């Protein structure tokens, strides 16, 4: 077959590097082709659809899909495979690759100026939430959660929004794996209580957490959907309990928060057609 030219790889003279056949890893090529195929709009793909899309046998497609699922880059409902937010960790890390952080940041800035509170966007990565974008007002006393912060999903408002968006079997698996430890006296630590709260989140389309993650911290979150209607992230506004009551959080902060999440959704649909 001869040498292959790698895309974007240049030698010291600025010429494309010729990659020998022996150095070309077909399984990596196949895995990236699968990710690319699943990145197109729609509700995921079956094994047969992936095989047709990338031009391989069903057996080969199945092995690649199961490998990527095992590594956490895909999820499946037993028939169709879809991408997971773990892809945010590829490339240059959680801040590159997908457009979410760049799209979200100006909207978070506007939300912060409206509410004068800490604002962020997080995704579900494994059993934890991962902060991918954030802004905060310039105050001595503030909520400290830099980009890259990981938190237990069950005890955070963004986590509950993301858990509420999971398929039933995915949520069952999460609840089987995770120990619901009390982080404060207010933390919900039983599966029935958490399920009831997730049902409430689905109905009202936002979550409020009152000092369950940390004493003195109240926060709200709203879902961010992709073009297929799946919950892919959550926007959050957080405040010190001494500044904001739960009633004020619901009345004054949740409406602009939900509007912000919807604005991010619209811009994401344009950025990732």
Q: Each PLM stretch: what is its role?
A:
Residues 2-8, 13-14, 140-215:
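Short, solvent-exposed recognition segments
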Residues 2-101, 262-270:
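N-terminal helix-turn-helix
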Residues 68-71, 118, 204:
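Alpha-helix C-caps/helix-loop-beta hinges
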Residues 82-178:
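Amphipathic alpha-helical effector-binding/dimerization core
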Residues 215, 233-273:
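Juxtadomain coupling helices with adjacent low-complexity linkers
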Residues 218-222:
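Short hydrophobic beta-strand micro-motif common in sensory/regulatory domains
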Residues 224-227:
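Sensor-regulatory modules in signal-transduction proteins
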């Amino acid at each position: 077959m001869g040498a292959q030219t790698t895309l974007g790889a240049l030698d010291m003279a600025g010429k494309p590097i010729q990659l020998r056949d022996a150095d070309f890893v077909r399984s990596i090529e196949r895995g990236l082709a699968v990710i690319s195929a699943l990145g197109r709009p729609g509700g995921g793909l079956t094994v047969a659809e992936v095989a047709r899309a990338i031009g391989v046998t069903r057996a080969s497609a199945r092995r690649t899909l199961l490998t990527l699922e095992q590594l956490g880059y895909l999820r499946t409902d037993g028939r169709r495979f879809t991408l997971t937010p773990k892809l945010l960790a590829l490339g240059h890390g959680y801040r590159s690759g997908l457009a979410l952080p760049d799209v979200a940041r100006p909207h978070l800035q506007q939300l912060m100026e409206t509410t004068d509170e800490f604002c962020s966007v997080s995704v579900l990565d494994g059993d934890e939430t991962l902060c991918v974008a954030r802004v905060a007002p310039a105050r001595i006393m503030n909520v400290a959660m830099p980009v890259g912060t990981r938190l237990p999903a069950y005890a955070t408002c963004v986590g509950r929004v993301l858990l509420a968006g999971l398929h039933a079997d995915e949520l069952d698996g999460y609840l089987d794996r995770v120990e619901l430890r009390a982080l404060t006296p207010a933390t919900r630590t039983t599966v029935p209580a958490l399920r009831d709260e997730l049902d409430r989140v689905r109905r009202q389309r936002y979550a409020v957490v009152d000092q369950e993650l940390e004493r003195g911290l109240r926060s709200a979150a709203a879902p961010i959907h992709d073009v297929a209607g799946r919950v892919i992230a959550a926007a959050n506004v957080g405040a010190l309990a001494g500044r904001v009551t739960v009633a004020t959080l619901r009345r004054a902060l949740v409406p602009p928060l939900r509007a912000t999440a919807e604005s991010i959704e619209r811009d994401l649909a344009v950025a990732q057609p």
